Amino acid sequence: NKSRKRRNRVSFLGAVTVEPPKPIPLTWKTEKPVWVNQWPLPKQKLEALHLLANEQLEKGHIEPSFSPWNSPVFVIQKKSGKWHTLTDLRAVNAVIQPMGPLQPGLPSPAMIPKDWPLIIIDLKDCFFTIPLAEQDCEKFAFTIPAINNKEPATRFQWKVLPQGMLNSPTICQTFVGRALQPVREKFSDCYIIHYIDDILCAAETKDKLIDCYTFLQAEVANAGLAIASDKIQTSTPFHYLGMQIENRKIKPQKIEIRKDTLKTLNDFQKLLGDINWIRPTLGIPTYAMSNLFSILRGDSDLNSQRILTPEATKEIKLVEEKIQSAQINRIDPLAPLQLLIFATAHSPTGIIIQNTDLVEWSFLPHSTVKTFTLYLDQIATLIGQTRLRITKLCGNDPDKIVVPLTKEQVRQAFINSGAWQIGLANFVGLIDNHYPKTKIFQFLKLTTWILPKITRREPLENALTVFTDGSSNGKAAYTGPKERVIKTPYQSAQRDELVAVITVLQDFDQPINIISDSAYVVQATRDVETALIKYSMDDQLNQLFNLLQQTVRKRNFPFYITYIRAHTNLPGPLTKANEQADLLVSSALIKAQELHALTHVNAAGLKNKFDVTWKQAKDIVQHCTQCQVLHLPTQEAGVNPRGLCPNALWQMDVTHVPSFGRLSYVHVTVDTYSHFIWATCQTGESTSHVKKHLLSCFAVMGVPEKIKTDNGPGYCSKAFQKFLSQWKISHTTGIPYNSQGQAIVERTNRTLKTQLVKQKEGGDSKECTTPQMQLNLALYTLNFLNIYRNQTTTSAEQHLTGKKNSPHEGKLIWWKDNKNKTWEIGKVITWGRGFACVSPGENQLPVWLPTRHLKFYNEPIGDAKKRASTEMVTPVTWMDNPIEVYVNDSIWVPGPIDDRCPAKPEEEGMMINISIGYRYPPICLGRAPGCLMPAVQNWLVEVPTVSPISRFTYHMVSGMSLRPRVNYLQDFSYQRSLKFRPKGKPCPKEIPKESKNTEVLVWEECVANSAVIL
């Protein structure tokens, strides 16, 4: 061997001498001397340092120095009582060019062939046997100080590798590696592991091992290195690199983790670093250490305080238990390795096995780079990572990879997943999904969220479509079959959009297609079902992402989500629907929501004041918790005479609001024409209080012509009558003990109280502290904001302008004269909620009637009278066109047969009459003039195909009530038409001559096929 010849020389006595190894010079970033002052040392440590320095001086490891460089030196006492020298070389290391590690990781003892005998040796003082380059010695000088500076300090410099120097491990590995190279070449069939100064030799037989060891001893000695005789291991159990090695098994050395020293981030960082080092042997999945990893979150200062939580304490106990029981196996060099991937919680777990013997565990980091990492991508990443590990261990790819996927899922992964393609690139082995039958893996906690189950990659057929949007002002919304606006605490459009998507997934328990104009939210929603969510310092974002994942996983029906570009001029329904969702979070809608939160104004008032649609205004009211509860069903309004102009007729009453305390007597006045309300809170209801209230009304509303009250003592007193006569006001009272004569003001009392409750419990009007302030806010809402049914302006506008826009004013009408039981032609003067005022003709007093006694006609007055006089009836037959009934909002169709009783004539068709009539005059079904009259039981109702029910038979019996039965109610959505036509064979067009016009038309030739319409 040439290198051996260079090292060895024959002396004149014939003995072989060993030349010292040639030193490796260091590369320096600067030649400027680095001097760090030596700190004082206690007398005991100073004496120990002198002894150690003399010992090293005698061995030739140090020499006296006059170097301009200096590093502090100190000593520590070991458990054995011996002292050890250490030099603080941090400042010197900063100016040394690093050589880089030659062994970036520990060798795995699992690669030692099973049943092979071993010998383990440790090199004695390895660093001190390797010289420094002569030009580098002065840079490692140190000073031994004198107490009280009574004598000059003693200075030395290192001639050998000092402990703590940046490149000492690399230089040591290089020297030892050179010494072992001849051994590896001669005994290539032996398995030799060398790490720093620890050397392990394994051979197939004991004789070969002894030969290898003998040759190794000589080579080590020739290199100037020495073997520590007290650290030679030749029998089991062997201890090497923290492991206990037996003939076939490998176990971690028994240790106990001290928990009392875990105080700072640095303490936990070191602990988890040590645990991660032995995790491939322990087999602790990532999910089982989540609480320990979570402690590392937060402040990045190494000295920042940390608390060991009870959950983390349990995980440390698990680590200690695993250290006591875990074991892996030495391999058979002739058998291939396999990789098993288990779908464990949090992230997948990999296991390297040989046959059924465990070789090593493989895990992914607890935290990821990406915010969302799909579980399939995690599997692919773990496969790629473990393939590299196996190649590093034995130089080959695994023979087989077992994954928790079916063959079809594997095929789809190769097509659709880039991460999968990278993780399995150039793999020529077998991909299988059959796991070996063994109990050693049964403790793993598996997950089912590997591939998406709820999220779809293609649009769903026959599913609802919902559009979402979010704004940066704390509003999220969606539109589709229904609309909803959600108030959020966030000032981010992306987060509000995320809230909108979460709300849609919660509100619609059926298959849906979601369209969003946020690419970020769309991608997050697509991935979140099976994704590992990266922890963020933003708690709000963590909560949103976790809620999104929980919502998706709890769904029973699939969904599809896609992205649409916002604010484009592209045509089509998708763009329009997205704009509609955008409008829901627009400033007008937000202002409408804010006003409703303050005043609880009704939907008509919101639409009148803001640029919002009817549906948006109604949704605001319907989603208000106070208004939803307080909008109770009301009875059909009766007919109370009303004024035909402002201040023509007032109604006045006193109601009680207990929450007002002493001022609980609330005097209420309402103008029966404009519905303008004024109220004052008083301490009583005597005449003086009534007069005080009326003066307040005059200041706001003006002076009325007539006032109607009940028969209370405050209203019937002479003092009150005198007061009214002074103001030229006539006074009437209702029937004693009958509140129906005061129906308008009684209903106003309820409306006012309801508004007070809304505003009190609504939460946005806390500034109104006194009773009168609360009353004023309610009056402002009712008079100046709310718009009531069949009106287009507020009560205040009607009262101040005298203009009342009745939707049917001036139209011809059929009205029922209850005295004569006849129907007459008249003209509408005004039309209100459940009532109307009709002019019977010239020079006749107007008649107040309930709307159920009114029917419209779209004919000239002459034709109508002629039609009425002849009592003409017109049949509707099968051959006629279907009658279209347009739905204004939603319609509740009565059940097939209501057999409870024949109803009153005026009740016939009541349900349908109230619900329909959007484009045409109201159409009713039943026995009443102007109603469609079925003469038979079976009619066919055709519902458009967009409805979930396409066809059903509508049964009716002549003269029967059309009241609905609860179990037969059917809801039809907004603005859809119902087509009614007779069912059966065609009937003759001509009416039989013997039929009577006033009777139900029944044809013998066609029973079940006709109806009459007046």
UniProtKB/Swiss-Prot annotation:
It comes from the Eukaryota. InterPro entries: DNA/RNA_pol_sf, HERV-K_env, Integrase-like_N, Integrase_C_dom_sf_retrovir, Integrase_C_retrovir, Integrase_cat-core, Integrase_Zn-bd_dom_N, Rev_trsase/Diguanyl_cyclase. Residues 811-859 bind DNA. A motif (LPQG) lies at residues 161-164. Mg(2+) 1 binds at residues 469, 497, 517. A motif (YXDD) lies at residues 195-198. Mg(2+) 2 binds at residues 469, 582. Zn(2+) binds at residues 596, 600, 624, 627. Residues 57-245 form the Reverse transcriptase domain. GO terms for molecular function: DNA binding; RNA stem-loop binding; RNA-directed DNA polymerase activity; RNA-DNA hybrid ribonuclease activity; zinc ion binding. Pfam families: HERV-K_env_2, IN_DBD_C, Integrase_Zn, RNase_H, rve, RVT_1, RVT_thumb. A zinc finger (Integrase-type) spans 587-628. Residues 642-803 form the Integrase catalytic domain. Residues 460-590 form the RNase H type-1 domain. Keywords: DNA integration, DNA recombination, DNA-binding, Endonuclease, ERV, Hydrolase, Metal-binding, Multifunctional enzyme, Nuclease, Nucleotidyltransferase, RNA-directed DNA polymerase, Transferase, Transposable element, Zinc, Zinc-finger. GO terms for biological process: DNA integration; DNA recombination; DNA synthesis involved in DNA repair; DNA-templated DNA replication. Early post-infection, the reverse transcriptase converts the viral RNA genome into double-stranded viral DNA. The RNase H domain of the reverse transcriptase performs two functions. It degrades the RNA template and specifically removes the RNA primer from the RNA/DNA hybrid. Following nuclear import, the integrase catalyzes the insertion of the linear, double-stranded viral DNA into the host cell chromosome. Endogenous Pol proteins may have kept, lost or modified their original function during evolution. The LPQG and YXDD motifs are catalytically important and conserved among many retroviruses. Belongs to the beta type-B retroviral polymerase family. HERV class-II K(HML-2) pol subfamily. PANTHER family: ENDOGENOUS RETROVIRUS GROUP K MEMBER 10 POL PROTEIN-RELATED (PTHR41694:SF4), ENDOGENOUS RETROVIRUS GROUP K MEMBER POL PROTEIN (PTHR41694). This is Endogenous retrovirus group K member 10 Pol protein. It comes from Homo sapiens (Human).
